[in-house]
Amino acid sequence: MKPPPRLQSLIEEGLIDTVVRQLMSGKEAMVFVVRCGDETRCAKIYKEATHRSFRQAVDYTENRKVKNSRSARAMAKGSKFGRQEQEAAWQSAEVDALYRLAAAGVRVPTPYNFCDGVLLMELVTDAHGDAAPRLNDVAFTPEQALAHHATLVAEVVRMLCAGVVHGDLSEFNILLAHTPGADGEEGVDGPVIIDLPQAVDAAGNNHAQRMLLRDVANLRDFFGQFAPALLRTDYGPEIWSLYQAGLLGNDTPLTGRFARAHADVDMQAVLREIDDARAEDAARRLRMAMAAG
């Protein structure tokens, strides 16, 4: 196919040989399947802020570190240069998170290069070598749902131990990839976490707890459709409580149960949570409608 203008410079620089096809167009980026030598990869082109439906909400960008003091001042003032720097920081956040999580052992797409607002990374595939489906497009047996849920809860823990909260984790941004078996053994399917530009620093962001609880609840609600027993679990508060106490490790046993302490109710906080939940539900319904269309 004819390369989109944003990929032409990467072709000229020899980072991409050919563009095969468009894979998807989402709320924050367009993704293309490309050939790089003998390998097939994907190129993620980030949309400009004016063309994105996902806002750079202050909840996500709070306390993100900016190395250049001039850039930090410009971003604080909201100048044209500051907005450009803020956009660049938003895009590079996913690259930073991918490298950080890969180093921590979290299954994410392997990043290869980031140039001119384009991220070159691994094309995650299924057993036939085609682009892997999102969880939202797959039906599971109860046993599969329990297994994949356990894997993803462990990945959330691993991410948190690395200091990262995804912030928008759901069935829409997790792929079901196939890993070939060794020496003729049968391969296995497993989840791969994608879409990380909104990932937040667990220790530096005041909204990290709420985001982690929402991420874990999304996993419970999705897999609970196939394994209803999961709907009675409460992993999110348990994970965060252990993290706050300094007791959370990659191999920390979890029960899925959490006893909440009774305290005076902060009605303003409750109302804020209700408003947030309504907004998240509206966004979730929009994503489902877009996926169905």
Describe each region flagged by the PLM:
Residues 161-171, 176:
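Catalytic-loop of the protein kinase fold
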Residues 1-25, 143, 147, 151, ...:
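Regulatory N- and C-terminal appendages and interdomain linkers associated
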Residues 129-141:
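AlphaC helix of the protein kinase catalytic domain
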Residues 124, 194-200:
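Activation of the activation-loop gatekeeper triad in protein kinase-fold domains
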Residues 1-131, 161:
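Conserved ATP-binding subdomain of kinase catalytic cores across diverse folds
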Residues 200-207:
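Short beta-alpha connecting loops at secondary-structure transitions
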Residues 35, 176-180:
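Short, low-complexity Ser/Thr-rich regulatory SLiMs
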Residues 88-95, 149, 209, 213-216:
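Amphipathic alpha-helical transducer elements in NTP-driven molecular machines
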